[in-house]
């Protein structure tokens, strides 16, 4: 079983993650992790903090000479802005300063419900941890999971498919071409014409003091049939993936395959017919069974069916607006216009990178549940033995 915990506040000294359950012998490096961290900080519409932070992960435990050794892996990302917050975010009681308490909660954030739940009179105790800054360390953990999946020929790729109601058209693009186009895009999208309209929409929102949401699409390819299970509700892979993606800050909806559109179609236009071709095995495919459509998004009954997993997630517009929304001061109960923290206009491209990470983590966990071992070699032997069985089925 693969599990992880993250810790740290947005303006604290660092973000930390501990990963448990990685097999020994997996090659990882801080360079590969930092590549994904850099992608998270890119994207059209990002805010001022991206000019301060240049995220770099440090591997503190569980890795020796570039390979995991079987013990927990610890990662940390230093917050470079900490130098400006040392007293405001100090763990020491001697630095307490009631004059800097934040009592004005912002609509759309965890501020007010969090303060009421934890009996805080200072909203900063909530907003620091609820901030999307936390996703930086989840991207780092996800990069490790992606390295594990890559050793089995499995890829997880994220794209922006919609911004502000402007949709990218995939048409007949194959996955490799989508990857090439999105890598060259400031919005991580594969439709150049739609990208220009998206950027113009973001520019308009910036001028109006507003923010923009959108939709990200995650495609996982190279997966075998049989990950997840139908036997219990909490073992269904689609349920676990949906929870992982919904855990990302500002995500308000998740769909797999056709998703909500399946409710609008007759069954004859929804379910993927099954075919068999024995020559697929000689061509390097994992199974002779296949489907000509993928409306299920690669999962049936909570189990992977051998097709690509396709997930889409809706991200709401960032709630911190430069044209402030109305709220109420927790202490005085007086109305006010919400305070402005540094913020993005559009963080949908970053959400695509974060969604990649959490999906990779859940898939790596499913792989280890199915083919687990103490070393990567043992996991690979179990995996290859299973593939022999599947090819002969």
From Swiss-Prot:
Residues reported in the UniProt entry to bind NADP(+): 40, 46
Class of this enzyme: lyase
GO biological process, one term: aromatic amino acid family biosynthetic process
Gene3D superfamilies linked: Chorismate synthase AroC
Pfam families: Chorismate_synt (PF01264)
Any single GO CC term annotated in Swiss-Prot or TrEMBL for this entry: cytosol
Name of this protein: Chorismate synthase
